[in-house]
C-alpha cells in the first residue's frame, strides 16, 4: 500500500522520519510568502490545498497521513480519500488541542478524528481526548531519528549545551539566559530564528551564548550529536519535546522540563528541571560533571525506544489493515509502497 505524508509546514522532522519508517514519502506543503496573517491566511491555505491535491493526484496513495495543526490540511486528504477509497491518518500534535489558535476549531478536529482510520497522538492525556471524541487513537511517543548526513561540529574546549528553541510563548527563554550567566564555564548554542527573540533579552545576552540562527539539517545534526546535552524546555504541560527524543536517538543526554509526561518519556539519560534559572544552572553543572553516566543512560533509553517503536509501527499497520481490509506489511515490517 502506497503512503503519502502531508505537512502544511516549512519543515517537520517528525513527519519526515515517520514517513521514512512507514516506507512513504513526506511532503512539506508551505507558501511562506503569505505569512500567517489574518488578511492572507485564506489565500495561503487555498494555495496549499491546491498543492496537496496535486501531490495526491500524482502519487495516488492508498493511505494519506496528515499533520495537524493546521486542521484544514486534512480537508483535501479526506476529499481525495472519499473519491479514491483511500484511508486518512491524522498526526495530531499538542498544539492541535492546546494552542489558543486551534481551540476554536475543536469541532472540526473532532469530526475529522472520528472519520480517520486512526489519530497518532503523542501522550496519554491527548489519547484520552481523542477517544472521548469517539475516535481511534494510536499512541506514538516518538519516532526513530536517523540523520542521513552529519556535519562535524567544531566545539569549543568548554562543555557545550545545545539549547533548542523556537522562541515560542511556552519557552522559558529569560530563565535559560539567566542560567547561562550563572555558568560562564559552559557554552550555550541557542537555535531558532533570532528575530523572534525579545529585544530586551537580546540586549542582555551573556557572552557564553551563541545564537546559531537557521541551521541546515546537517549542521543541526552535528550540534545535537556533538553537544554534551540538548536542552529543550516548556512551561506547557502535556507537551512532547521533539528535540529531546531527537537527542536521545543520537545517544545525547537531555535537560527537559519537570512534567509528568516528560519524566515518563525521558526516564534515563535526562535531567529534569522546574524551569527556574537556578534549576537550569544546576542541571547544566550536573551535565558538566556527570556527562559519561548521563550519556550511558541516553544510550539505554535509545535502545528501549527502538524496541517500543517496532511495536508501535506494527499497531499502525494493523489498524490500517482493519480499516482497509488489505495487507499492508512488507517483508521488513514497513507499510508497502
Where are these regions (language model features)?
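Donor nucleotide-sugar binding/catalytic pocket of nucleotide-sugar-dependent glycosyltransferases
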Residues: 13, 114-151
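A short, histidine- and acid-enriched strand-loop-helix "catalytic/donor-clamping" loop
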Residues: 35, 86-103, 117-118, 147
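Conserved donor-binding/catalytic core segment of Leloir-type glycosyltransferases
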Residues: 152-171, 177-183, 189
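Nucleotide-activated donor-binding/catalytic signature segment of Leloir-type glycosyltransferases, i.e.
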Residues: 198-218
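Acidic donor-binding loop of glycosyltransferase active sites
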Residues: 225-239
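Short hydrophobic beta-strand element within catalytic cores of glycosyltransferases
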Residues: 229, 251-256
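Conserved acidic donor-binding segment of nucleotide-sugar-dependent glycosyltransferases
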Residues: 269-278, 284-292
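A charged, aromatic-enriched C-terminal amphipathic alpha-helix characteristic of glycosyltransferases
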Residues: 292-323
